[in-house]
Amino acid sequence: MNKSGLSLGRGLYAVTPDEPDTARLLAKTSRVLAARPCLLQYRNKFASAALRREQAERLLALCRAAGVPLIVNDDLALALDLGADGVHFGRDDGSAAAARYALDASGPGRILGVSCYGEWPRAVAGAAAGADYVAFGAIFASPTKPSAARAPLGLLGRARRELKVTVAAIGGITLANAGDVFAAGADLAAVISDVFDAVDPCARAEAYRMLSRE
């Protein structure tokens, strides 16, 4: 149980790619959602505001039908306006405490996640500000962010022991190394490429779910 009062579970945290083709994004995401990941994050760093809104709105409808919470990356105003299930904040996205207040004011059960990179003090501050999960990364070399600094696996276990929040790992995670991430202490493996670029995204997402149970 986290600040939002929700159990975020253990397994896959699917994160959408920077996909300009909305039809293709929806088709792939539908297949991922069929495997019931713990969360889906809408992330598109290169889309216009209008396209982000259109894609997020349509993804929210898919998530509602699948019973999977939708988290909006970086954009609290969009998350609140659409009634999404939560927002994910990076270091440049504003105050986590202010986001927590706004989410709580919008209704019960809203989820706040914060990127902590490889920075333990940021995780402590995020948890104190009301984050439901803290995300560390890049755990491995990432095709999405090839220049990202690496975060040690040991942070996952420390967060699991010392913070009363869900622990997520991101960055270069594949089926080949996800077992190490869960064993180190992560509750959630946040994955973009290895799921959305798979020949069968549903089967790949299901494989993560099964792996998290081992």
Region annotations inferred by a language model:
Residues 1-96, 101-132, 148-151, 158-167, ...:
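Conserved N-terminal beta1-alpha1 strand-loop-helix module at the mouth
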